[in-house]
UniProtKB/Swiss-Prot annotation:
GO terms for biological process: mitochondrial electron transport, ubiquinol to cytochrome c. It comes from the Eukaryota. Heme b b566 binds at H97, H196. This is Cytochrome b. Keywords: Electron transport, Heme, Iron, Membrane, Metal-binding, Mitochondrion, Mitochondrion inner membrane, Respiratory chain, Transmembrane, Transmembrane helix, Transport, Ubiquinone.
């Protein structure tokens, strides 16, 4: 008799996606991050749901409701810190996942890659709106500064900002709509994840060599399920350690001060995972130019498949491209550090140099080095 998992209409889909899925035998731990992101999304939706049961999206009570969650709700402090630090874990996994895709040439699956870029934007939007909800000083001023960037759009900028704010400043209407969108977006993200997986399973997974692995496939279960579970344990241990030992390590102390429109914090900055883009924004002295650079710093991922000049897919056997890739990683770390520093000498010039290098490496140096490698290999 045929197994029910192969005949049942619903189980059949799950079976072909997670059990009998043929997977390349050479996948390294860099392929764990997709499933880790799924766990992160699950943790965020669950903790967020329970937080939403106690949170009030009103400027008068939002800050106090978060305090109430931490002090009076059973394990409310745990929910709150799991949710806040879970976002950090989400972005760590997200950036490593994108980095893996860049290194091993996974972007040649253009549909999967483009849905991934949409997912990245959706997660960034969700995280930004979530940061506004506790209604602390950095929540309020972060929302004011970032939404105000849209006023740089010619003709419609000012009206667009007021439309998003629901008034002439960040206020009750803004907080309420941000809460509504923050609640809604994770479910849209879940739908996009399904589309992402649908496109991935159309082509099959890439592997570290970048060479088609059709002759050498193994079933996903038990080989990769057990490997994924090990990844879950490592990540959840790290998250638990962060939450239980230093929950405020990645947060901003200013967010423990209730929002006050009359008092500006000395340094307005977003959460650490946006600092690289924030540094690029600040390094251009023109408002519209800065906004365009900010958007392009992420959107540049969409043109990477066009810029792929190498005859080889993966960087595994391309040492010169590897050097450039790790230089790009170093530049991103530098930008993240600069984003958290005040706007003064020497940070300004370091940020500008790193921003130029970021675009130069991706747009010019990587394609040029790929062509050189082709020539050296007599292709």
């Amino acid at each position: 008799m045929t197994n029910i998992r192969k005949t049942h209409p619903l189980l059949k889909i799950i079976n072909s996606s997670f059990v009998d899925l043929p997977a390349p035998s050479s996948l390294s731990s860099w392929w764990n991050f997709g499933s880790l992101l799924g766990v992160c999304l699950g943790v965020q939706i669950l903790t967020g749901l329970f937080l939403a049961m106690h949170y009030t999206s009103d400027t008068a009570t939002a800050f106090n409701s978060v305090t109430h969650i931490c002090r009076d709700v059973n394990y409310g402090w745990l929910l709150r810190y799991l949710h806040a630090n879970g976002a950090s874990m989400f972005f760590i996994c997200l950036y490593l996942h994108v980095g893996r895709g860049l290194y091993y040439g996974s972007y040649t699956y253009s549909e999967t890659w483009n849905v991934g870029i949409l997912l990245l934007f959706a997660v960034m939007a969700t995280a930004f709106m979530g940061y506004v909800l506790p209604w602390g000083q950095m929540s309020f001023w972060g929302a004011t500064v970032i939404t105000n960037l849209l006023s740089a759009i010619p003709y419609i900028g000012t009206e667009l900002v007021q439309w998003i704010w629901g008034g002439f400043s960040v206020d009750k209407a803004t907080l309420t709509r941000f809460f509504a969108f923050h609640f809604l977006l994770p479910f849209i993200i879940t739908a996009l994840v399904m589309v992402h997986l649908l496109f991935l399973h159309e082509t099959g997974s890439n592997n570290p060599t970048g060479i088609p692995s059709d002759p050498d496939m193994i079933p996903f279960h038990p080989y990769y399920t057990i490997k994924d579970i090990l990844g879950f344990l490592i990540m959840l241990t790290a998250l638990s350690a962060l939450v239980l030992f230093s929950p405020d390590l990645l947060g901003d102390p200013d967010n423990y001060i209730p929002a006050n429109p009359l008092n500006t914090p000395p340094h307005i900055k977003p959460e650490w995972y946006f600092l690289f883009a924030y540094a690029i924004l600040r390094s251009i002295p023109n408002k519209l130019g800065g906004v365009l650079a900010l958007v392009m710093s992420i959107l540049i991922l969409a043109i990477i498949p066009i810029l792929h000049m190498s005859k080889q897919r993966s960087m595994m056997f391309r040492p010169l491209s590897q050097c450039l890739f790790w230089l790009l990683v170093a530049v991103l770390f530098t930008l993240t550090w600069i984003g958290g520093q005040p706007v003064e000498y020497p940070y300004i010039i370091i940020g500008q140099t790193a921003s130029v290098l970021y675009f130069l490496i991706i747009l010019v140096l990587m394609p040029a080095v790929s062509l050189m490698e082709n020539y050296l290999l007599k292709w």
